[in-house]
Structures are given as structure tokens and as C-alpha cells.
Amino acid sequence: MVMGPSCGLVLADLGAEVIKVEPPAGDNTRRLEGAGAGFFPVFNRNKKSLAIDLQRPEGREIVFKLIDKSDVVTENFRPGALDRLGFSYEKLKARNPKLIYCSLKGFLKGPYEHRPSLDEVTQMMGGLAYMTGLPERPLRAGSSVIDIMGGTFAAVGILAALRSRERTGRGQLVSSALFESTAYLVAQHMAQYELTGEAPLPMSVKRPTWGVYDIFETADAGRLFVGVVTDTQWEVFCREFGEQDLAVDPRLKSNGMRVKERGWLIPRLAEIFKRCAQQDLANKLEAIGLPFAPIAKPWDLLADPHLLASGGLLEMAVMKKTIHVPALPLELDGRRLGKRSDPPAVGQHGRELLAGLGCSPGEVQALVDKRIVALP
């Protein structure tokens, strides 16, 4: 649902012409409600839509012609689904040797490669859900993080394949997968286990790495996360907050020593922070250069002054509403990557794309009448 579209989004935002080939009824994510309502609008800006029935020979022939003129094809179907329709890498490569074919799956080659998968499936089997939740209750991360990660890695692979084609003149098969993306994200925990012999604890009960790395309440019932992770930062904190006794306490000389003293140190710091209003504390921490963060909800970002000032939110028209979504988290030559077009209506660009393949207006209408192609 998200892995393939997120790959296309990265390429589209970077300037590629990305054509979304979807069924005549439209991509299923267009109809999701509730927690899924944001999927389609977030991952489909800057794309064109061709709505076509791939179960029909005429529909497949049109897509073959489109692929013949394309640099890249991406697919995010169940294993074997496109092969059965005649769109295998081998067949398309024979038609277009320069084609880069990117397959986004649950698993790379190996014993699991034929399994269908989902973001949550691989979060569970890849250990991320264990590290996120409680020991007895694994919990998926609060975003489709593996779908997005797998799609982003796919885009990186495509860019590398394009660069390789400049040298060799040949296309290639690129594969990205959810399970391997999850393993990549939990690599630090795997390495910790092998290096120390200790099983990493979930984040909910994890033994701290830093002496001060906590959420604190403020005088006005606010909350701030504060991180003091270096000895220099500790010196700054003690000096600026007037806590000289903590500065000279031999038990707190290094981060490792502060970790051991957290049992009494964190309550002491909580008392200090509790004297301040949230905004006053935030202003002071920013002024002295210590890491901090308010505890925000996703919708709070719609009014975030940094995102608003930096062009980090893109305005889009979706279902007769105006919404705002984050831009790709990049600047190129000091410029944020913006929106060229809103998420497309089903088949919005069908006439344009079919004309580019040599179809006359009458031929396009015949395809519509046969329900092979859908237009708005």
C-alpha cells in the first residue's frame, strides 16, 4: 500500500515523470478511511494516473508500449503476480534492454521470498515491534516506517542503476524488501547482543545509555524531553541552572557515572525543571544549546513555526479539501522540493498518455467504451 508509492514519491519529488498505473476503479488506498485516509494523498503528489485493466489483453498491450518508452518500472505486487500477467523482468528486458525494473517485496531472495508481507508483519518478525513495545506485548511503530524505508531504499537503488546505465548502456533488476529494511533498522541491537552477550531490552524498559535522557514535567503541567548526553553539556546545564553542587559531585563526573546515579539524579532534575513553565524552560534550553523537545502530536506539526517558515509543508487539494503534508526532507542547493501537481484523479492523464503512444481520440474513446481504460 505504501512501499511502492513511497518509492515513486521520492522519484517524482526529485523531478521524474512518474506514471501511476492503476485499475479502472482506482488504487485501493483512494478508498481507505480512518487511519488509512492519509495514505493516498501523502504518497501520490507529482504523479500522473493511467487507469487501465491489466486483465485485458488490450490493456496489457498499451502498458507494454508505455514500458518500451520508459526508463524505470517499479512494481509492488504479490510475488509472481506480474509474471502471470506477462510483465516479468525477463520479458520486459527483452523488449527494452535499457529498462531498470524495480521490484518491491516483503523479502529478498531466500527461504521467505515467496511469502506475502506487510509493514507490520516484518516489524514483528524483524524485532522492531519487540524493541518498540513492552516485553510481553510487541507494538508496531506509530507510522508505516518499514514501508517508507523500503520504498526509499528502492529509490536509492534505482538512482544507482541509472548511474550504472550511463556507463554500461544496460538496465538491471533492482530489488528492495520490507524484512531486510527492518533488519537494517535493528542492526544496532543485533550488534549489541553479539558484542556484549546481553539481550537488548525494549525501549519501554531499556537501560539508559545517557545520564539525562528523559521527559520532565513543568510548572504549568507541560512536558519536555531533555537530553544531556556529553560531559560538556552537563557542565553547561549545571552552570546555567545554578546547580554548583551537582557540578562538583564526584559521582557525576562522566556520563557513565551519571547513568549509575540516575535513581536519585533524575528526581533531583525533575524538581529543578518543575519550577519552570514549559515555554520558559524551552527558551532557556535553546539559549544555552541543550537538546530538548516538546511532546508533540502529529497534527501539532501543521502549525509548527519551523516547518511553516522553511517551506516544509506542501498545500494540496484532496477530495475538495485543502490539506498540508510534509515535503521530502531534503534541500538541494538550498531549495526545498515542492509540489508540481496534486494527487491525480483516477485516470486523469489517460488521454495525454495514450495520445503520446499514438492513440487517436476515437481509439481512446473505444478503449473507454470497452472499459479497458477509465477517464475522469
Task: List where the protein language model places each region.
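N-terminal helix-loop segment corresponding to the beta1-alpha1 unit
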Residues: 1-157, 161-167, 316, 345, ...
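Glycine-rich beta-alpha junction loops
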Residues: 25, 106-108, 178-183, 220-222, ...
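Conserved Rossmann-fold dehydrogenase catalytic segment
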Residues: 109, 135-143, 166-182, 201-208, ...
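Oxidoreductase and adenylate-handling cofactor-binding alpha/beta cores
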Residues: 129, 151-171, 184-196, 238-245
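Mid-domain beta-loop-alpha active-site segment that forms a flexible
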Residues: 144-159, 178-186, 229, 233
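Aromatic-enriched alpha-helical interface/lid elements that frame and gate functional surfaces
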Residues: 212-288, 292
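Terminal low-complexity tails and localization/encapsulation signals of metabolic enzymes
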Residues: 217-219, 300-376
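Conserved PLP cofactor-binding pocket of PLP-dependent enzymes
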Residues: 286-308
